[in-house]
């Protein structure tokens, strides 16, 4: 299965694609960020994020998309920008009929390090090891996107089976 992980943000939106599956070691397909200038208007920045994610969807052809859930922060402007960029990714995936997994930072950390309280250095170290990379992906947004993709690769299929077995059938 090929998964696109999206670490949403307006200044830097991390994107990472991995391939893998049950009993198959995950490997890196592509990793990077979409950058927008902090001086640009929000609408312009969201369009740039949308164009960037859309290009990644075209180029890498994922089967699923994993997006970080927004969590409360002291800076409301940061929260709003993160939520807006995440919504762009969700809409683009939905328009293509791709399943979307939403994960909290602690769920992602637990999936890749075994601890929901891991710091960025621990997450980066594990991403480097799990994907057999020679160096850690930079910036941190790119590493976080790969962590999201791995989290979905490992947890997404089980969650889908659980949802389809629940009364009322599958939901998104």
From Swiss-Prot:
The active site is at residues 7, 68, 141. One of its GO terms (cellular component) is cytoplasm. It is found in: Cytoplasm. Its cofactor is Mg(2+). GO terms for biological process: DNA recombination; DNA repair. Binds 2 Mg(2+) ion per subunit. Gene3D superfamilies: Ribonuclease H-like superfamily/Ribonuclease H. This is Crossover junction endodeoxyribonuclease RuvC. The lineage of its organism: Bacteria, Bacillati, Actinomycetota, Actinomycetes, Frankiales.
